[in-house]
Design a protein with these regions (language model features):
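Catalytic metal-binding/acid-base residues of hydrolase active sites
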Residues: 78
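Active-site-proximal loop/hinge segments that shape catalytic or ion-binding/gating pockets
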Residues: 1-6, 11, 20, 25-64, ...
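Short hydrophobic beta-strand that contains or immediately precedes a catalytic carboxylate
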Residues: 72-75
Length: 248
């Protein structure tokens, strides 16, 4: 089992793609520093995320720059080849084992203001809670908060991408990160496979408008085009993540 940080490499950031920004900085940065998130969008002073962190960490980060705040990931308790929290991205960073020592964990997600929160010695308890929760598998991750910088050259074991990115600018940028690059089995599905009750029939209709067979590459193209509501594209991703996993 490992600690993973999920992300969408080809979604927009700073006029390019997320993976390009990562390659420029050599770091996986906090949502307070990047201004983007694949979850809630309240990472600003006085926002919900700011208040959650203030409570969880007893004010430790209240006055620090965004770049010094923790980054969020998940304990990949099932050794899932897709990562520990696929709700938040088609690709992921797999961290070196020693990073666990400077991480904290909780269940459920911190958006729910959990009381079960602590260091790595609490992981067996948190994993048992997650296993028994009955939550959808996009929602049952054991959340991790990594304290201190995450540098690709020293703290990361590998970046794991969807195979649709092989031979693309996404892979080229990933190979500039200074860590290994791997590929998981892949996400792909026809919108006809999506249950309209999962995220709504309007989301299935949007998915159909994007193509007959969807991949993370296609969704990233749609996200960068800026034609559709980003929150709706995010929900199409939830459907692809839920119904589009495949085995080798």
């Amino acid at each position: 089992m490992t600690l993973t940080l999920q992300f969408h490499p080809n979604w927009p950031h700073e006029g390019g793609m997320v993976i390009e920004s990562m390659a420029k900085t050599g770091m996986y940065r906090s949502q307070f520093a990047t201004g983007i998130s694949n979850g809630g969008l309240t990472a600003f002073v006085g926002g919900d995320r700011w208040h959650w962190e203030s409570r969880l960490f007893a004010g430790r980060y209240d006055g620090v720059p965004g770049a010094e705040r923790p980054v969020y990931g998940a304990w990949n308790r099932r050794a899932d080849p897709y990562g520990g929290a696929i709700r938040f991205g088609s690709s992921y960073v797999r961290l070196r084992a020693e990073v666990v020592e400077r991480s904290t964990f909780c269940f459920p997600d911190s958006v729910h203001e959990p009381t079960d929160f602590g260091a790595a010695d609490l992981l067996p308890h948190l994993c048992a809670l997650a296993d028994g929760s009955g939550f959808d598998d996009l929602d049952d991750c054991v959340e991790a908060q990594v304290h201190g910088p995450v540098r690709f050259g020293t703290d990361v074991e590998a970046v794991v991408l969807d195979p649709c990115f092989q031979g693309t600018e996404v892979e080229a940028s990933a190979r500039r990160l200074g860590c290994a690059v791997e590929f998981h089995p892949g996400f792909t599905a026809s919108p006809s496979a999506f249950d309209p009750d999962y995220r709504g029939s309007h989301i299935v209709e949007l998915a159909r408008s994007l193509g007959d067979e969807l991949t993370p590459g296609i969704l990233g193209d749609a996200a960068r085009a800026g034609v559709h509501d980003p929150q709706s594209i995010k929900k199409v991703w939830h459907c692809l993540a839920r119904f589009g996993r495949r085995t080798r």
